[in-house]
Amino acid sequence: MKNYGAEIKSHRENLGISQLELSKRTGISHQNINRWESGTTLPNIAFCVKLADFYGVSLDELIGRENRS
């Protein structure tokens, strides 16, 4: 199974921001971000869309989905 939390974390780290900063900028709780990145829980689609928009990537890119051509 794909590690979606690692993908979310990678995008955050590429911007050079902390979980707390991501929380402040997106309005998503720090606890949720921590749980997703640690693999404890998965974000629902609404949060995925919010993160993808913030990072400026597609949903496929956010979760590390590769092109299936």
What are these regions (language model features)?
Residues E13, K24, D53:
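Alpha-helical residues within the helix-turn-helix
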Residues G16-R35:
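Short alpha-helical DNA-recognition segment
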Residues A46-E61:
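DNA major-groove recognition helix of helix-turn-helix/homeodomain DNA-binding modules
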Residues G64:
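Phosphate-coordinating loops and pocket residues in cytosolic domains that bind phosphorylated ligands
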